[in-house]
Amino acid sequence: MKERLKVCDPMNVRRIEYMDIFRGIGIILMIMGHIWFGQIFDTFKAAFHMPMFFIISGFFFKHKSKEELSTFEFILKKAKTLLVPYLIFGIFHFLIYYFILGNHDFKPLFHLLSWNNNGLAIAGALWFLSALFIANVIYFIIDRFVHNIYIKLIIILLIAVFGNYLELLHPPFSLSAAFVGVGLMHIGFLLNRFQFTKEISFLLNLKILPFLALSAITVFLIFVNQHVNMRLGIYSNPLLFWFNATAATVLGINLSKKIEAVFSDTILCKFLIEIGEYSIVFVCLNQLVIQVLSKSVDGILLNKLLILSFSLLILFILSRFIFKTNLRFIVGKSIKFKDLIY
């Protein structure tokens, strides 16, 4: 399956299908976590399923000169694609929480506008959007104003390490996760920048035996480290967190490349690609869909698999509807004038 060369966002970043597949896998893991498939699964996926999205964001980060893109323009574009959906879906879920579910409590609205890593109405996953926005802005500013690569690395390391412990101060807007996200973005940026060097090319195109060996080591270390939760600032052993997040992401990229190669043009491959492409809708609406479906079934494994299947189907339909209609403004996509009059 060939790489699509179409522009995917205002930053002129090309879509790479194996990365959309990887996003799709990450989204499915996130939804499974919200359905709850047990502590063992939760420990496994939590080690990397949120870090991977920051790494992917860094992978596609492109250096821009002041003439190409001002700092204000960058912040505005990121606000459009991350903060606009954050606020729209956050208020949407609050209205359901308040008027339909009858919870006459304004605390979730307060949390939406402040300490959003807990207490949101229905869609707790929205914290990720504010964290990703802040991480992108910080990373852009560092890239724009710090030109020495070694000083840049030191600054990013200090921010990332500080982020591992910042939650002790309970900052608003998931700031601790954003600080860690800056470090994860730099990992993604370096993977992309040096992907054609011998060492990084080897890591991103593992043969079967190295792939299995690294998988075994990573899974073992994930369970050695135990519980990780970026939202709450829980990392257990920070060194193991950074290794596991990076190694699992590298393995995920390898797996996605293999899926693209083996299942090219199949329904499975196309489905994963579209989940990845429409991932923001899945992030914003999955918990509402899960809650609705969970009302009608009990918690046995078979029913959880049914909830997962129907959730993916419903979210897929909703995402296509939003992206293909004038509603796409709620996910930060522009609406052309002709779309409003025809």
Question: Which residues are covered by each model-predicted region?
Answer:
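Alpha-helical transmembrane segments and their immediate juxtamembrane cytosolic regions
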Residues: K2-Y342
